[in-house]
Amino acid sequence: MRVLISAVGDTDPFRNFHDGALIHIARKYRPEKVILIFSEHTAKKQGNIEKALFSIAPDYKPEVKTHDSIISDNEVHIFDVMFQRFSDILQEYYTKEDEFILNLSSATPQIKSALFVINRLNGINVKAVQVSSPEHASNENIGHDNDENIDELIEVNEDNKVNFIDRTIEDNAEKFNQALLKKTARDFIEKFDYKATLDILDQLSDFPNLKSVREEIRDVVNCLSKQDVPQGLQHKKLKEKEQKILSAYLTIELQRERGNVSESFIRIKNLTEFILKDYIENRYLGLIKNYRKDKNKDYLSIFDYSKLLKTKREFELLRTIDPIIKMNSSRNMVAHSINPLDKDAVKQLGIAMKTLKTLVREQYHFSQSDFNFYQDLNKKLLTKLN
């Protein structure tokens, strides 16, 4: 069965000697069933709407059903309310066996917009139809025929003929769909979720800058998965080792921004150990080698490096890394158990991140611009996606 679901607006059933949207869609598609949704303001039209529907052709007698709930005039201009109301209505009547038509051109702008969005987001098999005005322009200044005699309006209706001019437009809303995908991609970029962004961009039709945005984000995604250095960082005037350290630190920042606290805990200690190893090797040649030999260790932990720093009276550096050492018990809990993190552990992470940034900045003299790499990348990507 073909079913038309339609709100009733001021231009229904007729306006300026022509069909309103509701009647025109029924004239074109001849639905066997018409479900009408009235507001308090339009409820008085029920008899005229039914009469107009039956005037389309002598042999056309659709089943007309009025939705039980009448929409308050106080709500018809509130988009959120209309979105929820019409979502519920569509779900109430929808069946997979029937072919549904949705009128996108009757009622208030908020109702029309709600129906338009519902059609795009619900993912159900509904044919959404718009109707252009007879003039194919705005009909804002054309009066309504609400107070005229319905029989006379039917008699003078210029669309009431076999070879009427079809003004229906089946809506596939491709531009809207693309705009929605683009907005979703922007939202993911702002959350530093580049993998999700790339998945969305791969669904977009081509537009200026899309290729370059995809390439930049794909590079970031690949580098994050392999712990490699993004091309944008490679272009900075930094030594290879500095690029790796900065990239490792920024990856930890990204994980924290995205709420991946557990991953941040694990990575902070690893990067700190690398920095301390680099610091000691550059200043105390052979110290680490001899310590490994004495202790018969291949891998040195943050505690080993701390002991070595104490032997060299590096008390300022020891004070700097103290919050990271204190954090280690929480880090071990994350790495070796499935227990959730408590509030104190999350607080420790914030302190440890500040400590790590201080350590990285002091040892390698990175600028604030270096630390803002992903924020600056996001600004560039968002500008290209405008």
Model-derived regions: residue spans:
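Long, low-complexity, Lys/Arg-enriched
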Residues: 1-99, 110-386
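Conformationally flexible catalytic loops at phosphate/diphosphate-handling active centers
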Residues: 102
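Terminal helix-to-tail segments of small alpha-helical proteins
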Residues: 106-108
